Amino acid sequence: MSSKKGLLYFRDGELLAQSGEARVYRFMDFLHLDIGPGHNLWAIESELEDYVWQINDRPKGDCLEIGLGLGVASKYILSCPKVKTLTTVEINKDVIEVQKQANPINDKRHLVLNADGLIYMYATDRKFDFVFVDCYALIDEETLPMIADYSRACEKVLNPDGEAVGWFDKATPEEFVGEFYNLWEIK
């Protein structure tokens, strides 16, 4: 009999890809991305339902995504019928590598750049019709100022009728929900 107490994706799952400190495991029919020696869970393929709810049918035209993760949101955005292109900016080259190995996106409309998303938005002259920002792990008093920086940068890269959405963590404490949503009311 096993002495294991519960199942863990990194112990009981199959390692599919590794680059640097980024790893992708398949566990219970879903991909799991973790980063670092402490197995910091960064993304789970089952988040698709959350992305569908949050992003909905907003993606259209030229789209920008900040944060790649497993590419789940990328695939959803690219599945939207009005999307012409998707540029995804990911700061961690190891995340880009393991995503390519474990969950590749074979769509000529998709471009992945290894860069800091905030710097990219301030440096680029490109304009986008939709921006999705998903590069933070939680929403609280420490991350809200950074999220506000991304929201302001979206104003620079959005076309006049464009929309921006920030990833919403369902576990966000109630005291931060209103402030978070107010950041994404971009005019």
Regions found by a protein language model. Give the residues of each.
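Class I S-adenosylmethionine
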Residues: 1-62, 71
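C-terminal substrate-binding/active-site "lid" region of AdoMet-derived donor-dependent transferases
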Residues: 124, 137-187
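Class I SAM-dependent methyltransferase core
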Residues: 65-66
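Conserved SAM-binding loop of SAM-dependent methyltransferases across substrates and taxa
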Residues: 70-82
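Conserved SAM-binding motif I beta-strand of class I
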Residues: 85-90
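A conserved beta-strand element that flanks and buttresses the S-adenosyl-L-methionine
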Residues: 132-134
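S-adenosyl-L-methionine
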Residues: 92-125, 130
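Conserved acidic residues
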Residues: 61, 84, 129
